[in-house]
UniProtKB/Swiss-Prot annotation:
Subcellular location: Cytoplasm
Keyword set includes Metal-binding: no
Keywords of this entry: Acyltransferase, Cytoplasm, Fatty acid biosynthesis, Fatty acid metabolism, Lipid biosynthesis, Lipid metabolism, Multifunctional enzyme, Transferase
Protein name per the record: Beta-ketoacyl-[acyl-carrier-protein] synthase III
Signal peptide boundaries: none
Active site: C112, H245, N275
Record's comment describing the protein's domains: The last Arg residue of the ACP-binding site is essential for the weak association between ACP/AcpP and FabH.
EC number from the UniProt entry: 2.3.1.180
Annotated pathway: Lipid metabolism; fatty acid biosynthesis
PANTHER family per the UniProt record, alphabetical: 3-OXOACYL-[ACYL-CARRIER-PROTEIN] SYNTHASE, BETA-KETOACYL-[ACYL-CARRIER-PROTEIN] SYNTHASE III, CHLOROPLASTIC
Superkingdom assignment: Bacteria
GO MF term set: 3-oxoacyl-[acyl-carrier-protein] synthase activity; beta-ketoacyl-acyl-carrier-protein synthase III activity
Lineage: Bacteria, Pseudomonadati, Pseudomonadota, Betaproteobacteria, Nitrosomonadales
Classification via HAMAP family: FabH
Length: 318
Protein backbone atom coordinates (compact mmCIF):
# COMPACT_ATOMS: atom_id res chain seq x y z
CA UNK A 1 0.00 0.00 0.00
CA UNK A 2 1.17 3.52 -0.84
CA UNK A 3 0.29 7.09 0.00
CA UNK A 4 -0.68 9.39 -2.86
CA UNK A 5 -1.05 13.17 -3.09
CA UNK A 6 -4.61 13.87 -4.24
CA UNK A 7 -4.83 17.61 -3.61
CA UNK A 8 -2.58 20.65 -3.24
CA UNK A 9 -3.21 24.17 -1.99
CA UNK A 10 -1.34 27.33 -1.13
CA UNK A 11 -1.84 30.79 0.27
CA UNK A 12 0.14 34.03 0.25
CA UNK A 13 -0.80 37.05 2.40
CA UNK A 14 -2.22 40.06 0.60
CA UNK A 15 0.55 42.51 1.50
CA UNK A 16 3.41 42.51 -0.99
CA UNK A 17 6.87 43.89 -0.19
CA UNK A 18 8.85 44.58 -3.36
CA UNK A 19 12.56 45.10 -3.81
CA UNK A 20 11.80 48.75 -4.45
CA UNK A 21 10.10 48.94 -1.05
CA UNK A 22 13.22 47.50 0.57
CA UNK A 23 15.38 50.14 -1.12
CA UNK A 24 13.75 52.72 1.15
CA UNK A 25 14.29 50.57 4.26
CA UNK A 26 17.89 49.35 4.04
CA UNK A 27 21.00 49.97 1.95
CA UNK A 28 20.17 47.72 -0.99
CA UNK A 29 18.80 47.85 -4.53
CA UNK A 30 16.45 45.92 -6.74
CA UNK A 31 19.34 44.97 -9.03
CA UNK A 32 21.48 43.73 -6.12
CA UNK A 33 18.67 41.55 -4.76
CA UNK A 34 17.59 40.10 -8.12
CA UNK A 35 21.15 39.40 -9.26
CA UNK A 36 22.10 37.53 -6.10
CA UNK A 37 18.83 35.88 -5.12
CA UNK A 38 16.38 36.00 -8.02
CA UNK A 39 13.77 37.42 -5.65
CA UNK A 40 11.51 40.25 -6.87
CA UNK A 41 8.89 40.36 -4.13
CA UNK A 42 7.76 38.66 -0.95
CA UNK A 43 4.44 38.54 0.93
CA UNK A 44 4.05 39.76 4.52
CA UNK A 45 1.39 38.56 6.95
CA UNK A 46 -1.00 41.20 8.28
CA UNK A 47 -0.91 42.29 11.90
CA UNK A 48 -2.49 39.50 13.94
CA UNK A 49 -2.33 37.02 11.06
CA UNK A 50 -0.67 33.88 12.41
CA UNK A 51 0.90 30.77 10.89
CA UNK A 52 -2.32 28.85 11.57
CA UNK A 53 -4.31 31.45 9.60
CA UNK A 54 -2.08 31.01 6.56
CA UNK A 55 -2.20 27.24 7.04
CA UNK A 56 -6.00 27.34 7.19
CA UNK A 57 -6.33 29.01 3.79
CA UNK A 58 -3.82 26.67 2.14
CA UNK A 59 -5.53 23.67 3.76
CA UNK A 60 -8.96 24.70 2.52
CA UNK A 61 -7.60 24.97 -1.01
CA UNK A 62 -5.96 21.53 -0.77
CA UNK A 63 -9.11 19.96 0.68
CA UNK A 64 -11.19 21.44 -2.15
CA UNK A 65 -8.71 20.19 -4.76
CA UNK A 66 -8.80 16.70 -3.22
CA UNK A 67 -12.61 16.72 -3.32
CA UNK A 68 -12.93 15.60 0.29
CA UNK A 69 -14.21 17.22 3.47
CA UNK A 70 -12.26 18.23 6.55
CA UNK A 71 -14.01 15.50 8.55
CA UNK A 72 -12.39 12.91 6.27
CA UNK A 73 -8.91 13.88 7.51
CA UNK A 74 -7.54 11.75 10.35
CA UNK A 75 -4.00 13.17 10.61
CA UNK A 76 -2.62 16.72 10.54
CA UNK A 77 1.09 17.54 10.45
CA UNK A 78 2.22 21.16 10.27
CA UNK A 79 5.81 22.07 9.48
CA UNK A 80 6.67 25.49 10.88
CA UNK A 81 9.53 27.40 12.45
CA UNK A 82 7.19 30.24 13.42
CA UNK A 83 4.33 28.67 15.41
CA UNK A 84 1.43 30.68 16.77
CA UNK A 85 2.66 30.15 20.34
CA UNK A 86 4.96 27.98 22.43
CA UNK A 87 2.13 25.50 22.86
CA UNK A 88 -0.30 24.07 21.90
CA UNK A 89 0.95 23.10 18.47
CA UNK A 90 -0.05 25.05 15.39
CA UNK A 91 -1.45 21.76 14.07
CA UNK A 92 -3.90 21.55 16.98
CA UNK A 93 -4.91 25.17 16.43
CA UNK A 94 -5.40 24.46 12.72
CA UNK A 95 -7.42 21.35 13.52
CA UNK A 96 -9.82 23.44 15.59
CA UNK A 97 -10.10 26.13 12.90
CA UNK A 98 -11.04 23.41 10.42
CA UNK A 99 -13.83 22.31 12.77
CA UNK A 100 -12.23 18.95 13.49
CA UNK A 101 -11.49 16.96 16.64
CA UNK A 102 -10.52 13.56 15.27
CA UNK A 103 -7.08 12.04 14.80
CA UNK A 104 -3.60 13.17 15.85
CA UNK A 105 -2.29 16.64 15.09
CA UNK A 106 1.29 17.75 15.70
CA UNK A 107 4.05 20.05 14.47
CA UNK A 108 7.39 19.24 12.86
CA UNK A 109 10.29 21.68 13.16
CA UNK A 110 13.07 21.18 10.63
CA UNK A 111 13.20 24.78 9.36
CA UNK A 112 13.36 24.89 5.54
CA UNK A 113 13.34 21.08 5.35
CA UNK A 114 10.21 20.99 7.47
CA UNK A 115 7.73 20.12 4.74
CA UNK A 116 9.93 17.27 3.50
CA UNK A 117 10.17 15.91 7.05
CA UNK A 118 6.40 16.29 7.54
CA UNK A 119 5.55 14.65 4.22
CA UNK A 120 7.86 11.72 4.93
CA UNK A 121 6.27 11.29 8.36
CA UNK A 122 2.73 11.43 6.98
CA UNK A 123 3.66 8.89 4.31
CA UNK A 124 4.68 6.43 7.04
CA UNK A 125 1.32 6.88 8.78
CA UNK A 126 -0.75 6.52 5.62
CA UNK A 127 1.15 3.75 3.84
CA UNK A 128 1.20 1.65 7.02
CA UNK A 129 -2.55 1.99 7.53
CA UNK A 130 -2.31 4.18 10.66
CA UNK A 131 -4.13 7.01 8.84
CA UNK A 132 -6.32 7.18 5.75
CA UNK A 133 -6.23 10.87 4.80
CA UNK A 134 -3.43 13.15 6.00
CA UNK A 135 -3.21 16.93 5.76
CA UNK A 136 0.42 18.06 5.52
CA UNK A 137 1.13 21.78 5.73
CA UNK A 138 4.15 24.06 5.61
CA UNK A 139 3.33 27.51 7.04
CA UNK A 140 5.62 30.37 8.01
CA UNK A 141 5.50 33.99 9.16
CA UNK A 142 9.22 34.75 8.96
CA UNK A 143 8.50 38.48 8.95
CA UNK A 144 8.05 38.13 12.73
CA UNK A 145 11.62 36.91 13.29
CA UNK A 146 13.29 39.21 10.78
CA UNK A 147 15.66 42.05 11.63
CA UNK A 148 14.46 44.59 9.10
CA UNK A 149 17.69 46.55 9.52
CA UNK A 150 19.83 43.60 8.42
CA UNK A 151 20.06 43.75 4.64
CA UNK A 152 21.80 40.37 4.46
CA UNK A 153 18.67 38.57 5.68
CA UNK A 154 15.61 40.82 5.39
CA UNK A 155 15.67 40.74 1.58
CA UNK A 156 15.49 36.94 1.50
CA UNK A 157 12.42 35.79 3.40
CA UNK A 158 8.64 35.99 3.08
CA UNK A 159 5.45 34.58 4.59
CA UNK A 160 3.18 31.92 3.12
CA UNK A 161 1.72 28.44 3.37
CA UNK A 162 1.34 25.35 1.22
CA UNK A 163 -0.55 22.12 1.85
CA UNK A 164 -1.18 18.67 0.41
CA UNK A 165 -3.66 15.88 1.09
CA UNK A 166 -2.25 12.34 1.22
CA UNK A 167 -4.51 9.31 0.91
CA UNK A 168 -3.99 5.55 0.96
CA UNK A 169 -3.82 3.95 -2.48
CA UNK A 170 -2.71 0.72 -4.12
CA UNK A 171 -1.18 2.72 -6.97
CA UNK A 172 2.35 4.02 -6.26
CA UNK A 173 2.48 7.68 -5.22
CA UNK A 174 5.28 8.47 -2.80
CA UNK A 175 8.01 6.05 -3.80
CA UNK A 176 10.58 6.82 -1.10
CA UNK A 177 11.72 9.46 1.38
CA UNK A 178 15.19 10.22 2.71
CA UNK A 179 15.89 12.41 5.75
CA UNK A 180 19.17 13.64 7.25
CA UNK A 181 20.54 16.03 9.87
CA UNK A 182 23.90 17.26 11.16
CA UNK A 183 23.63 19.31 14.34
CA UNK A 184 27.27 20.39 14.22
CA UNK A 185 26.12 23.20 11.91
CA UNK A 186 23.49 24.49 14.34
CA UNK A 187 25.05 27.97 14.65
CA UNK A 188 25.42 28.57 10.91
CA UNK A 189 21.73 29.36 10.34
CA UNK A 190 19.78 30.09 13.48
CA UNK A 191 17.41 32.28 15.48
CA UNK A 192 19.10 31.59 18.83
CA UNK A 193 16.74 33.24 21.32
CA UNK A 194 15.39 31.28 24.28
CA UNK A 195 12.97 32.15 27.06
CA UNK A 196 14.02 32.14 30.71
CA UNK A 197 11.69 33.25 33.50
CA UNK A 198 9.50 35.05 31.00
CA UNK A 199 12.37 36.97 29.40
CA UNK A 200 13.92 36.51 25.97
CA UNK A 201 17.62 35.70 26.09
CA UNK A 202 19.66 36.04 22.91
CA UNK A 203 18.57 37.51 19.60
CA UNK A 204 15.16 36.39 18.30
CA UNK A 205 16.17 37.31 14.74
CA UNK A 206 17.57 35.10 11.99
CA UNK A 207 21.35 35.05 11.64
CA UNK A 208 23.20 33.17 8.95
CA UNK A 209 26.59 32.55 7.39
CA UNK A 210 25.52 32.92 3.79
CA UNK A 211 28.56 31.41 2.09
CA UNK A 212 28.54 28.30 4.25
CA UNK A 213 24.80 27.85 3.75
CA UNK A 214 25.15 28.11 -0.03
CA UNK A 215 27.93 25.54 -0.35
CA UNK A 216 26.28 23.07 2.01
CA UNK A 217 22.85 23.47 0.43
CA UNK A 218 24.01 22.75 -3.11
CA UNK A 219 26.05 19.76 -1.94
CA UNK A 220 23.31 18.03 0.04
CA UNK A 221 20.49 18.88 -2.37
CA UNK A 222 22.42 17.09 -5.11
CA UNK A 223 23.10 14.16 -2.78
CA UNK A 224 19.48 13.94 -1.59
CA UNK A 225 18.12 13.87 -5.13
CA UNK A 226 20.60 11.20 -6.20
CA UNK A 227 19.79 9.14 -3.10
CA UNK A 228 16.09 9.13 -4.00
CA UNK A 229 16.81 8.21 -7.61
CA UNK A 230 19.23 5.42 -6.75
CA UNK A 231 16.76 3.94 -4.27
CA UNK A 232 14.29 3.57 -7.13
CA UNK A 233 16.72 2.54 -9.90
CA UNK A 234 16.26 5.84 -11.74
CA UNK A 235 18.62 8.33 -13.37
CA UNK A 236 18.50 12.16 -13.32
CA UNK A 237 17.19 11.97 -16.89
CA UNK A 238 14.12 10.15 -15.53
CA UNK A 239 13.09 13.18 -13.46
CA UNK A 240 10.18 15.08 -14.99
CA UNK A 241 10.23 17.83 -12.37
CA UNK A 242 12.70 18.93 -9.71
CA UNK A 243 11.04 20.99 -6.97
CA UNK A 244 13.71 22.10 -4.49
CA UNK A 245 13.43 24.39 -1.51
CA UNK A 246 13.02 27.91 -2.88
CA UNK A 247 15.90 29.55 -1.01
CA UNK A 248 17.38 31.60 -3.82
CA UNK A 249 17.79 31.15 -7.54
CA UNK A 250 21.54 30.50 -7.36
CA UNK A 251 21.08 27.49 -5.09
CA UNK A 252 18.26 26.19 -7.29
CA UNK A 253 20.16 26.54 -10.58
CA UNK A 254 23.44 25.27 -9.14
CA UNK A 255 21.73 22.14 -7.81
CA UNK A 256 20.04 21.45 -11.14
CA UNK A 257 23.31 21.97 -13.02
CA UNK A 258 25.17 19.50 -10.78
CA UNK A 259 22.41 16.94 -11.39
CA UNK A 260 22.40 17.59 -15.12
CA UNK A 261 18.73 18.56 -15.06
CA UNK A 262 17.75 21.21 -17.63
CA UNK A 263 16.24 24.48 -16.44
CA UNK A 264 12.91 23.71 -18.08
CA UNK A 265 12.43 20.75 -15.71
CA UNK A 266 12.95 22.83 -12.56
CA UNK A 267 10.04 24.50 -10.77
CA UNK A 268 11.28 27.86 -9.47
CA UNK A 269 8.84 30.27 -7.82
CA UNK A 270 11.26 32.08 -5.49
CA UNK A 271 11.02 35.31 -7.51
CA UNK A 272 7.38 35.73 -6.49
CA UNK A 273 7.52 34.99 -2.76
CA UNK A 274 11.14 34.75 -1.58
CA UNK A 275 12.29 32.10 0.86
CA UNK A 276 9.20 30.94 2.75
CA UNK A 277 11.07 28.19 4.60
CA UNK A 278 8.83 25.16 5.24
CA UNK A 279 6.16 26.61 2.93
CA UNK A 280 8.35 26.91 -0.15
CA UNK A 281 8.19 23.37 -1.55
CA UNK A 282 4.38 22.97 -1.27
CA UNK A 283 3.91 26.49 -2.65
CA UNK A 284 5.96 25.60 -5.72
CA UNK A 285 4.28 22.21 -6.04
CA UNK A 286 0.80 23.73 -5.93
CA UNK A 287 1.65 26.27 -8.62
CA UNK A 288 3.04 23.58 -10.93
CA UNK A 289 -0.04 21.41 -10.39
CA UNK A 290 -2.49 24.23 -11.00
CA UNK A 291 -0.78 25.57 -14.12
CA UNK A 292 -0.79 22.09 -15.65
CA UNK A 293 2.93 21.39 -15.73
CA UNK A 294 2.63 18.33 -13.51
CA UNK A 295 0.84 15.44 -15.22
CA UNK A 296 -0.09 11.86 -14.20
CA UNK A 297 2.71 9.27 -13.99
CA UNK A 298 5.47 11.88 -13.96
CA UNK A 299 8.40 11.51 -11.54
CA UNK A 300 8.91 14.46 -9.20
CA UNK A 301 11.73 15.04 -6.73
CA UNK A 302 10.78 17.24 -3.79
CA UNK A 303 13.71 18.29 -1.62
CA UNK A 304 14.75 20.75 1.05
CA UNK A 305 17.62 21.89 3.22
CA UNK A 306 17.38 24.03 6.35
CA UNK A 307 18.90 25.11 9.61
CA UNK A 308 20.31 22.38 11.79
CA UNK A 309 21.44 21.48 9.22
CA UNK A 310 18.53 19.30 8.11
CA UNK A 311 17.91 18.04 4.60
CA UNK A 312 16.00 15.42 2.69
CA UNK A 313 14.11 14.35 -0.40
CA UNK A 314 10.86 12.65 -1.40
CA UNK A 315 10.39 10.95 -4.76
CA UNK A 316 6.82 11.02 -6.07
CA UNK A 317 5.08 9.38 -9.01
CA UNK A 318 2.16 11.68 -9.74
Amino acid sequence: MYSRIIGTGSYLPEKVLTNQDLESMVDTSDEWIRTRTGIERRHIAAEGQMASDLALEASRNAIEAADIQAKDIDLIIVATTTPDMIFPSTACILQNKLGMSNGPAFDVQAVCSGFIYALATADMFVSSGKARNALVVGAEVYSRIMDWNDRSTCVLFGDGAGAVILTRDQKPGILSSHLHADGSYSQVLTAPASIHSGKIQGTPFITMEGGTVFKFAVKVLEEAALEALQANQLQPSDIDWLIPHQANIRIITSTAKKLGIPEEKVVATVSQHGNTSAASVPLALDQAVRDGRIQPDQHIVLEGVGGGFTWGSVLVRW
